[in-house]
Amino acid sequence: MKSSKKNKVLSTLAQLLNSRSDEIMRANGADMEAFPHMDASMHDRLKIDDNKIAGMIHSLEEVAAQADPEGKILYQHTREDGLKIENRSVPFGTILIIYESRPDVTIEAAATAFKAGNRILLKGGKEAFHSNTLLTRLWQEALTVNGEEIHWVEYLNLNREETQQLIRNNSRGWT
């Protein structure tokens, strides 16, 4: 995907976060109500307010402003026999990120992975389920509006056992 298209998706997502901030805060309110006895640090990580939305938008703008790392030539050398050797940055492919009660990670981690040309699978904590699923839907809306497939950013609604099984199944042959 061209860098200009990636940046357009990021810009569209920033616009969606801004225009749908009330909806985001309602979804976050459902998360907050589901866990009324959380400690103060958990509360601060989970809570989405206008400032946190502004921070997510700022993060998207910063990622869009960065040079596209995909396909960048890091090193190049031509041997005496004419063989050209090149070290070029390429996407990993698919990245799985498991995180707890920080819904802003749904935006920020996915933005970094997407800009680098990677698909991302997100597995957030159960305490941020409503926030994370809505933020993922907004990601997918930004992708769709720009003619891209939604598979670039997906949310995994898995319990602990299913998550461990996914990791075990995908780790075979690596250890």
Q: Where are the predicted features?
A:
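Conserved active-site and cofactor/substrate-binding residues in soluble primary-metabolism enzymes
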Residues: 5-8, 19, 23, 51, ...
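Secondary-structure boundary motif
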Residues: 19, 144-145, 168
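Short glycine-enriched loop/turn motifs at secondary-structure junctions
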Residues: 40, 90-91, 170-171
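Conserved small-residue-rich beta-alpha loop and adjacent elements
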Residues: 58, 65, 69-141, 146, ...
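Conserved NAD(P)+-binding/catalytic subdomain of aldehyde/semialdehyde dehydrogenases
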Residues: 94, 154-175
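Intrinsically disordered, low-complexity linker/loop segments enriched in Gly/Pro
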Residues: 147-150, 160
